[in-house]
UniProtKB/Swiss-Prot annotation:
Gene: ilvC
Cofactors that this protein relies on: Mg(2+)
Name assigned to this protein: Ketol-acid reductoisomerase (NADP(+))
Active site as annotated: H109
A molecular-function term among this protein's GO annotations: NADP binding
Domain KARI N-terminal Rossmann residues, every copy: 3-183
Length: 337
């Protein structure tokens, strides 16, 4: 089924220019939304808790900052861009008591709405505007007169104005310059979680670590294994990002292409596909979200344990040593401090 696409001519910027927008959070997406909306002539304020390290940064960039409760009371459009696991408590404590008839509650990701962790009053418009790129790219493209494709969705529309408002907001951050796709909270949430877990984060990470283990256990130097299964991954992903799988196969050697065709299906086979379906089923049923919430309620103990085990994998030790040789690689603070 073809998706609905919208561009600049389909969106009326004056709609969002006539509203007061509170952006909750000032991370990657929060700063991009706020600055771009401001530059589009929108009245914007940032909601950050007292003591947040981001307060000074936002103020230095000329933005008005208040607590989430203060800016929610002032605004009639509230964009929630805080971390998923913090959104429900922020909504309950700071946003919900200040909601008024005619307000709109927007999100950059649908998890909390789709899985009923947040239930907005019936008189509030509930929507989503989600650029398909990191905040620094959203902001850079906007400044350059371009845009990053975005998704919009409407979950609750008491006044029948939700889509026009979402498109106007998307135009304010440059999304309609590239193209905006209409979706649903269900589709965005479930596809996003599946991509992260089965392919982008979980699947890729385990593939890399297992490949490293196989090579080291076979007697190859850890440094050689690291280069072959992790370091060179960026070269392949960049080619796929720029032109798809066909571009990647065109660009690599015939030896690599032929070997990939033969061996790829031996690694990712029908059994793997069935396990991926099971992951999707856990997402669709809400099982993953229940476990995510339980982890937060238990003080992040499960997540911290998984992080610790991951950090102790031999590939991390080898990688840090090799990255010391790479002057062109931007080093994370944890490795340079």
């Amino acid at each position: 089924m073809a998706v609905e696409m919208f561009y600049d001519d389909d969106a009326d910027l004056s709609i969002i220019q006539g509203r007061k927008v509170a952006v909750i959070g000032y991370g990657s997406q929060g700063h991009a939304h706020s600055l771009s909306l401001r530059d589009s002539g929108v009245d914007v304020r940032i909601g950050l808790k007292e003591g947040s390290k981001s307060r000074e940064k936002a103020q230095e960039q000329g933005l008005t900052v208040g607590t989430p409760a203060e800016v929610s009371e002032w605004a009639d459009v509230i964009m929630v861009l805080a971390p998923d696991t913090a959104q429900a408590s922020i909504f309950t404590n700071d946003i919900e008591p200040n909601l008024k008839d005619g307000d709109a509650l927007f999100f950059g990701h649908g998890l909390n709405i789709h899985f009923d962790l947040i239930k907005a009053p019936e008189f509030v418009t509930v929507g989503m505007v989600a650029p398909k790129g990191p905040g620094h790219l959203v902001r850079r493209q906007f400044v350059d007169g371009k845009g990053v494709p975005a998704l919009i969705a409407i979950d609750q529309d008491p006044k029948g104005e939700g889509q026009a408002l979402a498109l106007s907001y998307a135009k304010g951050i440059g999304g309609t310059r590239a193209g905006v796709i209409k979706t649903t909270f269900k589709e965005e949430t479930e596809t996003d979680l599946f991509g992260e877990q089965a392919v982008l984060c979980g699947g890729t990470e385990e593939l890399v670590k297992t490949g490293f283990e196989v090579m080291v256990e076979a007697g190859y130097a850890p440094e050689m294994a690291y280069f072959e299964v992790l370091h060179e991954l960026k070269l392949i992903v960049d080619l796929m990002y720029e032109g798809g799988i066909a571009r990647m196969n065109y660009s690599v050697s015939d030896t690599a292409e032929f070997g990939g065709y033969l061996s790829g299906p031996r690694v990712i086979d029908a059994d793997t596909k069935e396990r991926m379906k099971a992951i999707l089923a856990d997402i669709q049923s809400g099982e993953f979200t229940r476990r995510l919430v339980a982890n937060v309620e238990n003080g992040n103990t499960e997540l911290e344990g998984l992080r610790k085990a991951n950090a102790e994998h031999p590939i991390e030790v080898t990688g840090k040593k090799l990255r010391d040789l790479m002057s062109w690689v931007d080093r994370p603070i944890t490795e340079t401090a």
